[in-house]
């Protein structure tokens, strides 16, 4: 007869045991190699140091060329899977350049639109703690809070110097000012740290 000794103090881990305190879902800029990009990685590294929390980084899976809808569908899917599997995890959305546009669509379009066919459910706002956008071309149309007021106070949008993507200007000056759009310019200027401080205060 096989006797199994009693084990005391053992608890079966729940699904939430493996859940991070914070899930950052970040979309890289146009033509950056797969991953979260320089700004995304720098932002998450800073957030981990600032908060001391378990911060997971999910890099939005999309080509980062012109297919904003593909990125928005993936970002939305990740938000929804995090909500379902880790309901207590605080979600942070972010993006740089084209990735900021991906985030705009995810948050501002509540219905299927062209190739975007996976809109967020209404209760997503209860899980999304903050949004950080860098070099966002939406400045030409208005900030994300103008399209979805729920996120107005949760969003930080940063535009470096005369970055022509987020600073509407004469097209003739774009080439001369393009260096202000570089990811490293945002990092070196302290704007990524500024976003870290903002987001940390909302977690």
Q: Where are the predicted features?
A:
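Extracellular/periplasmic catalytic domains that process cell-envelope and extracellular macromolecules
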Residues: 18-19, 85-86, 122-126, 148-151
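Extracytoplasmic/secreted cell-surface and envelope-processing proteins
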Residues: 33-36, 68, 101-104, 114-115, ...
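Surface-exposed loop and adjacent secondary-structure segments within mature catalytic domains
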Residues: 146-172
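Secretory targeting and sorting signals
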Residues: 1-16
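Active-site catalytic motif of lipid deacylating hydrolases and related acyltransferases
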Residues: 18-90, 162-201
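Active-site nucleophile loop of the alpha/beta-hydrolase fold
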Residues: 128, 132-139, 160-164
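Short mixed-charge
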Residues: 113-130
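Gly/Ala-rich beta-loop-alpha elbow adjacent to hydrolase catalytic centers
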Residues: 93-99, 103
């Amino acid at each position: 007869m096989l006797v199994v000794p009693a084990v005391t103090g053992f608890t079966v881990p729940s699904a939430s045991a493996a859940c991070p305190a914070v899930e950052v879902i970040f979309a890289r800029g146009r033509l950056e190699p797969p991953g979260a990009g320089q700004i995304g990685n720098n932002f998450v590294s800073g957030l981990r140091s600032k908060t001391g929390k378990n911060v997971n980084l999910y890099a939005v899976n999309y080509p980062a060329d012109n297919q904003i809808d593909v990125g928005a569908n993936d970002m939305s899917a990740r938000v929804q899977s995090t909500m379902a599997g880790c309901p207590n995890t605080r979600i942070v959305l972010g993006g740089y350049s084209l990735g900021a546009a991906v985030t705009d669509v995810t948050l501002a379009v509540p219905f299927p639109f062209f190739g975007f066919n996976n809109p967020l459910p209404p209760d997503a706002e209860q899980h999304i703690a903050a949004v950080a956008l860098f070099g966002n071309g939406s400045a030409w149309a208005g900030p994300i809070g103008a399209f979805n007021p729920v996120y107005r106070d949760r969003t930080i949008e940063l535009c470096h110097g005369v970055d022509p993507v987020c600073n509407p200007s004469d097209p003739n000056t774009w080439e001369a000012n393009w260096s202000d759009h570089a990811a490293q310019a945002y990092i070196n200027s302290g704007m990524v740290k500024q976003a870290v401080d903002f987001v940390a205060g909302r977690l």
